[in-house]
């Protein structure tokens, strides 16, 4: 065990000679001077007590006591550990090794072509990091050559044929070549490919992505694309068939006067619907009349396919929340329409049509009667009748 020097021992003796310090270690010295041979036996109410004869020593006798060397030995251990701890804290950290700079000399000839160099200036930090990552990539070609494009360039068919024959799977290559030979005349002799259609003759001859991996037929994809285009063309035709403006003769003075009697008389005539729709356009609510008219046209259809297509068009134009011409419907009616869209019928929008009809009757019809559109029309017809 390491021992303290003579100077440190003298300092500790002076320090512990104080009364306040002596009282802290007083039980230790009393225990050392405990005399077990001297006991005074007293009998007090039947209990035996051993009263030791403890001699207390003044602070001046601390250096002469036999417990002082043991105390010094106990204190030397924590003091030495504290000294080692503080010396470790005050010790300087070892110098760091200098960082190795990346060598971009193989890539410097390619920098002017890529417009990345500025004379002899130092490369930016971000660019150096990118170049370092490029150098760390496995399989990089030596000499700074440019990397190959990610997508392979299509090779001529002769090279593909030779590559397929020289591949380790000759059966797969031969089957692929046979499939291509069969597809080329089949695509050229397809009756559905009219000469007037752009790209119809070359669509089957060009190999698609599936032919390279699955060896499927391109003719089936061509037929599928043509079938997918048919509903689109039909939907455009059906969308054009939906009424946007009704042809009607000029209304008479009696008809215009009858519009003021009830909303039903206004909606029953084409001239009344056109006049009312012109008013709704000024209030930015023309979609209500368009939706009502589209539902009336849907009720006249009998073909199931046309009904399904027209129902889908009406849903996309007026029911969908993504449509700019969405009509105002409550949640119950929307839920019913969404459930019935699986198998739509002629009357799928009856509840929605009635709700929009009621909305126009209560909200828009009174304002139409007081609008300038109706008053000007009524005044012009009245003047014509007077002149006649």
UniProtKB/Swiss-Prot annotation:
One of its GO terms (biological process) is G protein-coupled receptor signaling pathway. It is a lipid-anchor. It holds the Pfam family RGS. It comes from the Eukaryota. The keyword Cell cycle does not apply. One of its GO terms (molecular function) is GTPase activator activity. Residues 262-378 form the RGS domain. Its main location: membrane. The keyword DNA-binding does not apply. Residues 185-197 have a biased composition (Low complexity). Fatty acylated. Heavily palmitoylated in the cysteine string motif. N- and O-glycosylated in synapsomal membranes. Isoform 5 is expressed in brain at high levels in the caudate nucleus and temporal lobe. Residues 138-199 are annotated as: Disordered. Gene3D superfamilies: Regulator of G-protein Signalling 4, domain 2. GO terms for cellular component: cytoplasm; nucleus; plasma membrane; trans-Golgi network. Keywords: Cytoplasm, Glycoprotein, Lipoprotein, Membrane, Nucleus, Palmitate, Phosphoprotein, Signal transduction inhibitor, Ubl conjugation. It is found in: Membrane; Nucleus; Cytoplasm. Inhibits signal transduction by increasing the GTPase activity of G protein alpha subunits thereby driving them into their inactive GDP-bound form. Binds selectively to G(z)-alpha and G(alpha)-i2 subunits, accelerates their GTPase activity and regulates their signaling activities. The G(z)-alpha activity is inhibited by the phosphorylation and palmitoylation of the G-protein. Negatively regulates mu-opioid receptor-mediated activation of the G-proteins. PANTHER family: REGULATOR OF G PROTEIN SIGNALING, REGULATOR OF G-PROTEIN SIGNALING 20. Forms a complex with G(alpha)z/i2 subunits and mu-opioid receptors; the formation of this complex results in mu-opioid receptor desensitization. Interacts with OPRM1. This is Regulator of G-protein signaling 20. The lineage of its organism: Eukaryota, Metazoa, Chordata, Craniata, Vertebrata. The gene is RGS20.
